[in-house]
Amino acid sequence: MLVISRKKDEAVLIGDNIEVKVVGVDGNNIKLAISAPNNISILRKEIYEKVKNENIKATNKNIKILKSLK
């Protein structure tokens, strides 16, 4: 994992077409602006993990229901 420091209005490029820019700093909160092509998904990790876990739970429930129908 690469760890770097950036100040307000400084940016990082990822590949040729993704830019992550620091647009604000307020105490422990950092506001980022991300520019990327439309085909690139940009997700907050905590939301992604929550949705993934809920999908796994739903799948497990569906498997149990299907097995009970045999």
Swiss-Prot record:
Pfam families: CsrA
InterPro entries tied to this protein: CsrA, CsrA_sf
Keyword RNA-binding applies: yes
Main location as per UniProt: cytoplasm
Gene Ontology CC terms, in alphabetical order: cytosol
Record field: transmembrane: none
Example of a GO MF term: mRNA 5'-UTR binding
GO biological process, one term: mRNA catabolic process
Keywords, alphabetical: Bacterial flagellum biogenesis, Cytoplasm, Repressor, RNA-binding, Translation regulation
SUPFAM superfamilies recorded: CsrA-like
Cell compartment(s), UniProt: Cytoplasm
Family statement drawn from the similarity comment of this UniProt entry: Belongs to the CsrA/RsmA family.
Function per UniProt: A translational regulator that binds mRNA to regulate translation initiation and/or mRNA stability. Usually binds in the 5'-UTR at or near the Shine-Dalgarno sequence preventing ribosome-binding, thus repressing translation. Its main target seems to be the major flagellin gene, while its function is anatagonized by FliW.
HAMAP family: CsrA
SUBUNIT field: Homodimer; the beta-strands of each monomer intercalate to form a hydrophobic core, while the alpha-helices form wings that extend away from the core.
PANTHER family on file: CARBON STORAGE REGULATOR (PTHR34984:SF1)
Protein's recorded name: Translational regulator CsrA
Organism: Clostridioides difficile (strain 630) (Peptoclostridium difficile)
